[in-house]
UniProtKB/Swiss-Prot annotation:
Family: Belongs to the universal ribosomal protein uL11 family.
UniProt signal peptide: none
Domain of life of the native organism: Archaea
Gene behind the chain: rpl11
Quaternary assembly: Part of the ribosomal stalk of the 50S ribosomal subunit. Interacts with L10 and the large rRNA to form the base of the stalk. L10 forms an elongated spine to which L12 dimers bind in a sequential fashion forming a multimeric L10(L12)X complex.
Organism: Nitrosopumilus maritimus (strain SCM1)
Any Pfam family matching the protein: Ribosomal_L11_N
PANTHER family the UniProt entry points to: 60S RIBOSOMAL PROTEIN L12, LARGE RIBOSOMAL SUBUNIT PROTEIN UL11M
Protein name listed in UniProt: Large ribosomal subunit protein uL11
SUPFAM superfamilies registered for this protein in UniProt: Ribosomal L11/L12e N-terminal domain, Ribosomal protein L11, C-terminal domain
Length: 159
């Protein structure tokens, strides 16, 4: 029968044997709790965030492999800002503030999965996500920070 792939979005460190994973894994004959515990161990760094997970099961040998994706940029920014959700009125109301170091940290996390050509380009994308969430950067609006990035003010952060 070959390989079976099960893709799901789970809460980091909080996957359970309930839906969607348990019912999908059951018919494949693997130890469900062993798989769930392995997922929770691999996603513990993303605690509380939605993380894409793919479980690949060889239905003949019952061996499995777990691939962990990266949470969305918005989820990573909200974690850095210490907020649960965005402002709801981005551009006029502000839900939080992050440092440029936090933006660079998120940009580095997203860099390998991005189509952008440089860390600076990814950082500008992350600042755009900050705007959508209503999160300021270094106490300034994301539009001001984008202008500063374009002027080269933050270039030392992107080395």
């Amino acid at each position: 029968m070959g390989e079976q792939k099960i893709s799901s979005l789970v809460t980091g460190g909080g996957a359970s044997a309930g839906p969607p994973l348990g019912p999908a894994l059951g018919p494949l004959g693997v130890n469900i709790m062993e798989v769930i515990n392995a997922i929770n161990d691999k996603t513990k760094d993303f605690e509380g965030m939605k993380v894409p997970v793919t479980v690949i099961v060889d239905s003949d040998t019952k061996k499995y492999e777990i691939e962990i994706g990266i949470p969305s940029a918005a989820a990573l920014i909200m974690k850095e800002a210490g907020i649960q959700k965005g402002s709801g009125a981005s551009g006029t109301e502000w839900a939080g503030d992050v440092t440029m170091d936090a933006v660079v940290k998120v940009a580095n996390t997203k860099l390998e999965n991005s189509y952008a050509s440089s860390l600076k380009s990814v950082a500008k994308t992350i600042v755009g996500t900050c705007l959508a969430l209503g999160v300021k950067v270094e106490g300034k609006t994301p539009k001001e920070i984008t202008a500063e990035i374009n002027e080269g003010k933050w270039d030392e952060k992107f080395q």
